[in-house]
Amino acid sequence: MSEFPEKAAIVGGGPAGLAMGYALQHFGIDFEIIEQNADFGGLWNRDWDKSPIYDSAHFISSRTMSHFTGFPMPDHWPDYPRHDQILEYTRDFAKKAGMYQKARLQTEVARASPSDGGWTLTFGDGQTARYRWLICANGATWDASAPELPGDFNGTIRHSRDYNSSDEFAGKRVLIVGAGNSGADIACDAAQRADHAGISMRRGYWFIPKHIEGVPGDVYGAAQPKIPLWLKQKILRKRLLKQVGDPTRLGLPMPDHELFETHPLLNDQILHYLRHGDLTVYRDIERLDGDGVVFKDGVRERFDEIILATGYTWSAPFLPDDANPFREGRAELPLSIFPKDRDDLFFISFVKAAGSSITLFGEMAWIIARALKAKGAEKDKLRAKIAKNDFDLRKGLKMVSTERNKAYINRDAYMAAFQKLRRHMGWPKGEDI
């Protein structure tokens, strides 16, 4: 073990990697952030060829509820900041927290090799470095997942990751496949610029307005009293149907699930374009057919371009197979952090939950930093708890059975699981970073 310095390698300089570095710095643990691009930012850095960010992208959680620990976003910013503001905020945090002094920029991790006592990282230029711990913060939304569609298509097909601007849709008939938040955004862009815009939806979704009673939806939700999940679903369902109306009037399928059993859509604009006839809803695709698409209800429509807003595969390509937890694009890790069979490998950012990801990364980073500090009997106690893995991360939330939802958690349950681990370990409840 003496060959490996007491130092952590954080792979990835996006919000998760920066939150991780900040936590380690607080606990006095040496670290280095290894970032393949010339600057921090992760997915918000549009200079990266794998960034999924497009011109119209905004934060889908509010600035009030989304921030690095002790570093709120500026009060004069909009409730839902633009992508360039989030990049600016991320880099400002990195400067003020001293993360640039701990960075190895423009450095790709080609391979991470475990051995007894640590990790040897081989970089893209062939150089190597040794670390006691490896923390994967390389992001969950860059490795595009694109389904094979049956049939032949005369037009162009591309993943939403490669989309940049609504100008690309001018004069075209465009179909967006997938109704996640990015798919809904891009469908709205197409509704503004394309000759014809359509969105193919496999199922109906609940649409949550970005503002409720004049405040951001997450701010409104945080101010509500704690009630059982079933009651929250019932009350909010009634409220949404009253505010949004019958979705089938707009051609949308009625949701076949309760609220929060798959991701809701935080989008006000898509309903506007549907109501004005600028966007058309289509069912799931049956097959491609030359210059058109045939849908499962028998409808055929002509299109020039198809955008696959079909999500991302989780991966850490630098890990060896025997240490790589990702199977079929997802991983089931205790607390979405810990492999059961290694005490020197951790994951941060590979989690799906409602609400702010940046705030969640701060919580995950605190737990990882504490785990790195644990020695002797404390470490043994922690590893035994991780092996037991008796954390309930859903607390009665029944998710629709899809690949996307395999790793989806109930945010309240996740926070409760962190508190449970803190109590079990005797870690100070109010310890902040």
PLM features: what roles do these ranges have?
Residues 2-56, 72-181, 188-205, 210-211, ...:
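Flavin (primarily FAD) cofactor-binding/catalytic cores of flavoenzymes
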Residues 58-62:
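Flexible "cap/lid" subdomain of the alpha/beta-hydrolase fold that forms the substrate-access gate
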Residues 65-66:
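Active-site segment of extracytoplasmic enzymes that catalyze sulfate/phosphate-ester chemistry
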Residues 221:
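Basic, ligand-binding patches in group-transfer machinery
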Residues 214:
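Short, surface-exposed amphipathic charged segments that create phosphate/polyanion-binding patches used
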Residues 158-161, 390, 394-396:
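Non-catalytic, mobile gating and regulatory segments of ester bond hydrolases
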Residues 378-394:
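The conserved 3'-phosphoadenosine-5'-phosphosulfate
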